[in-house]
Amino acid sequence: MPQQNCTVILAAGEGKRMKRDLPKALLPVLFKPMLQWVLDAARAAGAGRACVVTGCRHEQVEAWLAEHDPEAETAYQPERLGTGHAVRMASEFIRAHAQGGSVLVLNGDAPFLGAAAIRGALRRHLRDGNAVTLISARLEDPTGYGRVLRSGPEGPVRAIVEQKDASPRELAVREVNSGAYWFRQEDLLQILPEIGNDNAQGEYYLTDAVQLLIRKGRRAGACPAENPDAVLGANDCAQLHRLNALARDAVLGALMRGGVDIPCA
């Protein structure tokens, strides 16, 4: 049987700071829900069938999918217990749709992670025989992001260190984790039950899956996206406004490069 790949999109977040009636993943960037941006990128990359993990206001997300993307499947996360727990809710989907292949995990509020970055990461994932390959970005100002620590300048990943836990030397690293990953299916299914919640929030984090695989001697890699905006998401209205501004500027820039005259005022 040929290898199959599949996609799991995390869209269970409450988005409390948005103070909107819609689930965060359905909030628009240039009149299109962020979730649609993510689904479109995964499909354009040829990443197989998609499962959207829902949670807060799941009925709204499920109704939107039924109308706009009925091919997507859903898995329900009844409690928001972290990204690792969310992926675990999609375990049956992963077993059924990534037989012998790889699983792409994406955040439902990251509209600028494009198909090219997804395809490039999969090529590196398969070429290097990685158990997991995270999609990273190199930022001028990496403040607030988890740093990607490598064994050598372009070597395998040895750790992901969150900002609050990083040493001064680690804080100087400009390569950051986008929160998007390709996992080998068998490794992901094996490691998900081993993720613990011994942390201040009592949650199960998908980044711990990467650390557990590394400790087991599996190879972890990272593939930097050419567009550093790939790491951007929206946790509040100001960040959502920034995403819309960036998307608008990209459209205007493309038009002007094509010869369209757009007045400055």
Each model region followed by its residue ranges:
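Left-handed beta-helix
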Residues: 2, 201-265
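Short beta-strand/turn micro-motifs composed of small residues
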Residues: 11, 54, 107, 136-137
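Conserved N-terminal catalytic core of the sugar/cofactor nucleotidyltransferase
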Residues: 1-6, 33-116, 120-123
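Conserved core of the sugar-phosphate nucleotidyltransferase
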Residues: 113-200, 207
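Short, high-confidence coil segments that cap the C-terminus of an alpha-helix
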Residues: 47, 99-100, 129-132, 218
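N-terminal nucleotide-binding beta1-loop-alpha1 segment
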Residues: 1-20
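Short aromatic/basic micro-patch
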Residues: 28, 112, 182, 233-234
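Short catalytic helix/loop segments, enriched in acidic residues and glycine
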Residues: 21-38
